[in-house]
Amino acid sequence: MLDRIQVKQLTGALIVVTFLVIALGGVVRIYDAGESCPDWPTCFGTWDFDISEAEQGAWYEANPDEIDSRGAGHRYTTFQIFTEWAHRLLAGVVLGPLVLLNWLLVRREEELGSEVKLASSVAVALIVWQGAVGWLTVRMDNEHWSVALHLGSALAFMLSLIWLWLATARDLGEQPEWATFDPVLAARWRNRLAWISAATLFTLFSGAFVSTTAGANTSCGVNGLYDSWPLCQGEFLPSIHDWVMQSQVIHRWLVVAVEVALLAASYIIWKEIGEGQSGSTLCKLIWGATGLYLVNIGIGASYILSWDMTDGYLEYLSLVHLMLASLTFLVLATAWLGSTIALNERGS
């Protein structure tokens, strides 16, 4: 049966599953369910998710050191518990074993070189690390820094899978056109892409910090168009008195800086291709990332402007905002990875 499973296809499936795990993590956050399973890897001492409020209370009485950060009387709905339970199930029961299986399959394929083996080992190390960070996030009651670390580790793991897929496709001679990078243009753009990708990731972290810090979401006000967005409390450049509570302002400044860099990159690579340089793959990826980023700015604005005195924000917009931000980073990081692989191939 294992002979029928191909590394390239399994790796592609793992990339999709990882993106779903990240999305489920976002669902956990928007439903405020990060502490709905206060222990790890079990959930209120069981492997189930259908736990009544009475059963939750009994567990807290037996574990007085594990009181919820929202107060001793706080209880969770079955749906909230299910979101965290499903997130753990998909990551630990589905994703983890398949990553190990992929590692074994890589070593059975004679056509695959040392880079593929290295990438598969990195993926295994990162999935183990991600499990440890997940435990830490639970232990720290979803502190903002632990949530950002958990998200960053997930993106690093997904990037290792993309690296594995690209290297496998190259070794098998099955690279599609969209994954074929011109080494001349790659040499010019690799460092630029590294800096832009890093800036995009840092901006993503700042957004995660805002969304998990009490009061930060409303720090620019809830007075609607212009006053709350694009301005902040009616000011274009408000003074910073509290770096934590006003982290949304800093996040917005970072967003503007990255978007300017992306627009500049899109223009420069368009000019270079127009002057006879090949490399349409790189151009499409940079343009795609720029387009995603622009759309995501609109999603972020819609989230801020969605405030309602009764229902608060439309939290599903926050989830879309997270996923588009993650996708933008992954597109840019894939462009950097592809450029690096193309340069290594030319140098070998």
Language model feature labels by segment:
Residues 1-348:
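Polytopic transmembrane helical bundles with strong interfacial aromatic enrichment
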